[in-house]
Amino acid sequence: MEEYIMVLDQGSTRSKCILFDKKGEVLGESEREVEPIYPKLGWMEYNPVNIWASQFSVTTELLAKYNISIEKIASIGITNQRETVLVWDKRTGIPVYNAIAWQCRRTVEISEELNKKGYGKVIKEKTGLVLDPYFSATKIKWILDNVEGARKEAERGNLAFGTMDSWLIWNLTKGEKHMTDYSNASRTMLFNIHTLQWDEELLEIFQIPKSMLPEVGPSSHVYGHTDSILFGKEVPIGGVAGDQNSSLFGQTAFEEGAAKNTYGTGCFMLMNTGNKPINSQKGLITTIAWGLDGEVTYALEGSVFMAGEGINWIKDNLRMIDSLEDAEEYALSVEDTNNVYMVPAFGGLGAPYWNPEAKGVVIGLTRGSKKEHFIRAVIESLAYQSYDVLKAMEEDSGIVLKNLRVDGQYSVNNFLMQFQSDILNCKVEKPKNILNIAGLGAAYFAGLAVGFWKNKEDILKNNGIEKEFNSSIDDRRRKVLVEGWKEAIKRTI
């Protein structure tokens, strides 16, 4: 009897496998760290062979650990770090170069050159995206232009490109399927989110041969089956979505205007805008949330590049804390930051500013500043950056947010969640499974594709809020705090 959905969750720092039951509860999980490669300052890569090896190993480990027969797996879901991209040889399955990470800034010059030529407008109109090194297209172009023989082989039709989901599907099916879903395709800067097709003009702008492109399908859809040699049985791959999009679905943000914010290395806020895309005028991006039941759902998104990375920085580089728990303890030991603000723009600024040249800034230091003030300012920076995104989102959508669902590694910090509610002046809701929400969304997509869950109403039965936070400060105090943050941003830009 098929009792579980198995999810492959390939993230920026680890590869993970999770088993979910029909109630959306986690039966078990297994994970392995993935090691980023930093060839030069501002560059970031992954070894794609190691990515696949780590993802496959945690899958077999999990099944063995809980003594789960593959016969009990109804479907496999995939969720992945978005924009990170690689190119491989279709004939051998061997990558021609490492996967270039979404955080990598090596293509700043390519982006600037294309912007100078005036391509930013048409790219925004067709893809909903800002012409920035963050997205996949400039990374693919870089590989074709800089890896010896790559462009020639691509023009001969011998190379394929894909985001992490495509790479996993290729390996799970032993090269039988080269596919992606709408949500991941919409992050490449090559996919027209209105026609739902790869766009010829965009391919021409970035000089990428059409033969490299994966087939695109809905997020909930049987993409194919795993090769029987892997698990001893063919298992349907029923769900695929980028991690932030999957998180929105896992939060059951099915209604127009529903929003979530994920607190990880970066912060990613998405708002469901229904079946029509909203063209942002406030520095956000328009993206495809998911494809389901013959329809496409769109979203507004604010992507903050460096959020929790600021906390990692004070832990790993400055050695101020030993753990996330330490950070919260220090923050609560003082009443405020004593007017210290910190902007962690280590890799430029994302939404809503989109300034790749911005650098990190600390303002307000005095002789009375303590370590505790600085640590608190770093934590508060996550909430302030999310404030900037949410205000832009409200202006674009015309919707004033009453509550915000949260998830991700740093959402366990209750001080941060309370401060977020204070600054936004809205309810913050922390659901169950906050560390596996993206995985849960992928499980829902995979389960819906094979009838494990009948429909979205069936899924809503699994909903549950673990903790709520409500604003505890007045408008006057909120205004003073936000004005200080705005001054810090001015110094950054």
Swiss-Prot record:
Assembly, per entry: Homotetramer and homodimer (in equilibrium).
Organism: Clostridium tetani (strain Massachusetts / E88)
Binding residue positions for glycerol: 82-83, 134, 243-244
GO MF annotation, one: ATP binding
EC assignment: 2.7.1.30
Name of the featured protein: Glycerol kinase 2
Pathway named in the protein's UniProt entry: Polyol metabolism; glycerol degradation via glycerol kinase pathway; sn-glycerol 3-phosphate from glycerol: step 1/1
Role this protein plays: Key enzyme in the regulation of glycerol uptake and metabolism. Catalyzes the phosphorylation of glycerol to yield sn-glycerol 3-phosphate.
GO cellular component, one term: cytosol
Binding residues for ATP: 12-13, 265, 308, 312
Family: Belongs to the FGGY kinase family.
BP term (GO), one: glycerol metabolic process
Alphabetical list of InterPro entries matching this protein: ATPase_NBD, Carb_kinase_FGGY, Carb_kinase_FGGY_CS, FGGY_C, FGGY_N, Glycerol_kin
Keyword flag Ion transport: no
This protein's record includes keyword Kinase: yes
Keywords from the UniProt entry: ATP-binding, Glycerol metabolism, Kinase, Nucleotide-binding, Transferase
HAMAP family: Glycerol_kin
Binding site residues for ADP: 12, 16, 265, 308, 413
Regulation affecting activity: Activated by phosphorylation and inhibited by fructose 1,6-bisphosphate (FBP).
Domain of life: Bacteria
Coiled-coil intervals: none
Chain sites annotated for binding sn-glycerol 3-phosphate: 12, 82-83, 134, 243
Catalytically driven reaction(s): glycerol + ATP = sn-glycerol 3-phosphate + ADP + H(+)
